[in-house]
């Protein structure tokens, strides 16, 4: 299958680096220091596909500074569409868009609607909790575990949710599985659906994630239970697994 002329926004990020390595035959556009928030009059009508990954993604930060998230995520998406007017859009949304309870989630829902109203071809992916190692990021661990490796203490935000152990439930998906789905979306016709959930279909609590990590590596952290974080969803599970997705990795592979 011929690879289209591809632009990846956020190509220097965790997911973007892995995706770029999986598209070796794609024609690359090296657009140096382009900030999606500040368009410089770039218009490239020959680009046939944009994988739009660039965004701000911290739920707590979005609650503290919502305008930052709306200007970057929504305004930036509009700028991307103006820069590549003829491109198929492959958009990275979020599982939080199912029940948005933060400016981050709301910003992604807005982007989804703008894309549907504007783009002739689009595939909207709702990402769940991406993790796992890759050549560009050998560990790919959540910030909480990265911090715990240094301090010996892991903070769980909220232990009184209506879940089996009181902690949040998440669908963890490996970065390799996510980027395989993105490659398919680049190569194949646009889905033109409301959304395509990119998750494993297997849910785990935050505590289960932590226990799996500790068991795999023989580490023990002191667990501190903090207050719930504003904007955190108690449960984030996929309603179905997208046909673009063939999950191969387990939670043990991700940690």
Where are these regions (language model features)?
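Conserved Rossmann-fold NAD(P)-dependent oxidoreductase catalytic core, especially the SDR/UDP-sugar
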Residues: 52, 78-105, 122-125
